[in-house]
Amino acid sequence: CSDCCRGMGNSIFLDPMDIYRLTTGLECTFEDLLSTCVELQVVDGFIQPNMKMTGKEEQCPFLNEKGRCNIHAIRPGICRLFPLGRCYDGEGGFQYFLQIYECKKEPKSKVKIKNWLGVEEIGRYENFVAQWHYFQKDARKVLGEISQEALVKKLHLYLLTLFYQKPYDVKRDFYNQFEQRLQEAKQQIGIAG
């Protein structure tokens, strides 16, 4: 029905894998995305890209006139997830839950999570999701304790560049590249592990 593709405001946050998929699938740069379908916002002091809704219905820019997704194969993780949600346990993991009243489409049928998400290597993907969530949580804490505003701003821009603006090598495994960047970022801002 595509109701979840309309009126979402700036809530469709994009993670590094989403940007990787979009830039690879659309054969463009992060800057190209910023000039067309992505915008930046500050959330809890963290610079985050999100999908930029368009028109009077505030719809996803990739929703076609028939109400179908033009980028379904490379759609963002939050779009893949809906109407599921994630509950993070605080110990490095998470569980899925079904938002039973959020999706208006009927009838609903049982689908395995790995099939619903439609990602290859579900274990590696879930590991990435957890790592990214907990890294952001730790980074917010560390950056929140720094009193020098100019340094905090510099570190936020560093993270934006490292995880989003700096192109990923499409000939190399995304997860390995992300891991390398994650370790670099942790070291740079002083997160253990």
Question: What is each stretch, according to the model?
Answer:
Residues 1-193:
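Short loop/turn segments that flank or connect secondary-structure elements
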